[in-house]
């Protein structure tokens, strides 16, 4: 009888333990589900916040006491993308409020992307029917529209730069003083600095010799292009050339070296970072700026199959551009897009 009681008690204890374990597991599972849901909601909110940050083109950030006593910076950003040309303009406008200077001050950083639009084409009507269109030049143009009260006082980069990477820092200090240096870093403890940094391997940056107080232009031009074990100049008609019997007019890509070996600016595109420093007379309330991003394309024409016909090179034969007009309100420190258009078959030509 005692043994039966012990068995019943043990059985009851086992059931109780199992029920308690199940309840604990269910509670833990519910707690985990709650945590996962909270995490998901947190991630969703973060993603929504990030999307708002990306789509909010009128960003505003004020940093007091950054330019000496009572100085501050107001930052705005405008982004314009054109699907037809596959070009994106992203401009940062930094308004510098300096009580020791009698003019408005503005830094404009021109960023974004100019996609390569690398293309292999077939043109059966020509003997050299297999074509390669590649971006031989990229151009960024900035000009003040019909307003002599707003002037460009400095720019980055300057002159000609042939290094694979470009790094420069612009620094503004109270009283309208400014300076620029190579590399990334602040030039003084009591100043506001802005840096530019971009890659241009196998290309050169050239600031136009015709730049003035209302117009600046930069060209990023292909030089000696390295791909695989080859190095050929942009002016060489044998650039990217491949003579093979498997190439046909139906497969123009086979008449050229593998595109995966091409330099990044040929294969993918260019991400500019150019800077302009401007001053404005305080009697002038608004100024418009016209910004143009352009892609120039060379065309290489090869004949498919085994042959002895020379390839053909046509420089700056094609091009696409995006032109955007921005209006700055100096009093309210705001920026808006007032006009935009794009077109094809418009390679940049100086002059």
UniProtKB/Swiss-Prot annotation:
Residues 30-60 have a biased composition (Basic and acidic residues). One of its GO terms (biological process) is cytolysis in another organism. It holds the Pfam family Leukocidin. Keywords: Signal. Coiled coil: none annotated. Gene3D superfamilies: Leukocidin/porin MspA. It comes from the Bacteria. Residues 28-71 are annotated as: Disordered. Residues 1-27 form the signal peptide. One of its GO terms (cellular component) is extracellular region. Disulfide bonds: none annotated. Belongs to the aerolysin family. This is Uncharacterized leukocidin-like protein 2.
């Amino acid at each position: 009888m005692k043994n039966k009681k012990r068995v019943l008690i043990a059985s009851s204890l086992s059931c109780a333990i199992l029920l308690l374990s199940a309840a604990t597991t269910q509670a833990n599972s519910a707690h985990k589900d709650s945590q996962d849901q909270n995490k998901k909601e947190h991630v969703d909110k973060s993603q929504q916040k990030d999307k708002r940050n990306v789509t909010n083109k009128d960003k505003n950030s004020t940093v007091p006491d950054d330019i000496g006593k009572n100085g501050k910076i107001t930052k705005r950003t405008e982004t314009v993308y054109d699907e037809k040309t596959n070009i994106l303009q992203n401009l940062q406008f930094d308004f510098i409020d300096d009580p020791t200077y009698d003019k408005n001050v503005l830094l404009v950083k021109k960023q974004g992307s100019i996609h390569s639009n690398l293309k292999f084409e077939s043109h059966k009507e020509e003997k050299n029917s297999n074509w390669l269109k590649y971006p031989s030049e990229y151009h960024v143009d900035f000009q003040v529209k019909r307003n002599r009260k707003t002037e460009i006082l400095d720019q980055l980069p300057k002159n000609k730069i042939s290094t694979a990477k470009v790094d420069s820092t612009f620094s503004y200090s109270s009283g309208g003083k400014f300076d620029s240096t190579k590399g990334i870093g602040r030039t003084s403890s009591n100043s506001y600095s802005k840096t530019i940094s971009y890659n241009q391997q196998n290309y050169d940056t050239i600031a136009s010799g015709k730049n003035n107080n209302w117009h600046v232009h930069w060209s990023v031009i292909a030089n000696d292009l390295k791909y695989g074990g080859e190095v050929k100049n942009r002016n060489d008609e044998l650039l990217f050339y491949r003579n093979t019997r498997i190439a046909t007019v139906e497969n123009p890509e086979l008449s050229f070296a593998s595109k995966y070996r091409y330099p990044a600016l040929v294969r993918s595109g260019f991400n500019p970072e150019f800077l302009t420093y401007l001053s404005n007379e305080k009697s002038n309330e608004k100024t418009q700026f016209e910004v143009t991003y352009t892609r120039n394309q060379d065309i290489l024409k090869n004949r498919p199959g085994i042959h002895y016909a020379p390839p053909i090179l046509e420089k700056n034969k094609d091009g696409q551009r995006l032109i955007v007009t921005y209006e700055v309100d100096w009093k309210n420190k705001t920026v808006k897009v007032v006009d935009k258009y794009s077109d094809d078959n418009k390679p940049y030509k100086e002059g």
